Amino acid sequence: MDETALAQQVGQVMMANDRATRETVGMDLLSCTPGRASMRMVVQDKHLNGHQTCHGGFIFTLADSTFAFACNSHNHNAVAAACSIEFLKPAHLGDELCTEGVEQ
């Protein structure tokens, strides 16, 4: 199996096993190739905080999940040791948030 096919299979298996990503948060895996992944999440009512904007924890979860798919695309278990995020502007109900993770 070539590395692109392996990465796609890893992404499918990870997504199938990750109920939090798929069901609880409602993210979609758009692509998973060697060292790269892209995901999306449409901001739903369940994602809104008291200011009626997307809770930062959901945005961080989307980024972290994208990172996980990219880093695990070679079929070697990997987890984050540390990460940080800068929020540039709020996301609102119905916004489509798209992420791309690239291995460095």
Residue ranges with predicted function:
Residues 1-104:
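Terminal targeting signals and extreme-terminal segments of soluble enzymes
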